[in-house]
Amino acid sequence: MNLTVSDILEFLENVAPSSLAEKNDPIGLQVGSKKAPVKGILLTVDPSISACKFAIDQGLNLIVSHHPLFYNPMQSLTPDAYPGNVAYYAVKEGLNLIAWHTPLDKVSWGVSAALAERLGLSPESPILSETSLGEGNGLGVLVKFSKSVKLGELAKEVAKKVDSWVMMVGDENCEVDSLGICGGSCSFLMEHLKKLSVKTLLTSDVKYHTAKQAEIEGFNFLIVDHGAAESLVLPKLKEKLNQFLSKRGFQIPVVIFTEKSPYKIIQEV
């Protein structure tokens, strides 16, 4: 009996239910067939051409990415422009592409919990809880420090442990006793955290005007590379997937693929 793409979709549904997905989040099988036999699985943040070529080189025919390839209807499917070029290449090479996005953001063991774990911190609760969808599920995590730490020192620790550049909004000498963590683009959680008397958020992709507002209001941001933060969930997903495969009696390779950040730090002020 062959392992199929449908079996992997069932696995994902069990470990990070689709009911956790944000409205209009295009999760699931985006390219390929549910009936296709699975020879090997690639886990990655983004379904890129590089990821596809690596999968082919490794003999893997299923890619499970965090980010979807398609968010909006495509206007063309050609080898010349993204994202159509990825779909074109995947179909040509017989690859199957699954995206499993916000369920991995919200599940209790997911993206933000993995980021906290990398920092050696224990989450107390989600920032935005969705207990109706399971205990501990929700967006982001809250952590408290037994002893306060200066924001600047915390930024240096984050840079070292996450292996990412870090931008900081706030006074580096500010004492931090609690922290919101949300892998991905979560600056919108600032207002919610302020209501919880938490004045620092570790996240990605903070816009200028949001940063300016935070600076004026005394709220702190630690901003890290989006891909670096979200890639930390992949080893946890791999572990769960290997357990699933072992119980089913399959010996299928599961490989993590990471790409360099598109951002390059040229000069520090």
Predicted regions and their residues:
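Active-site catalytic microenvironments in core metabolic enzymes, especially phosphate/sugar-handling
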Residues: 1-269
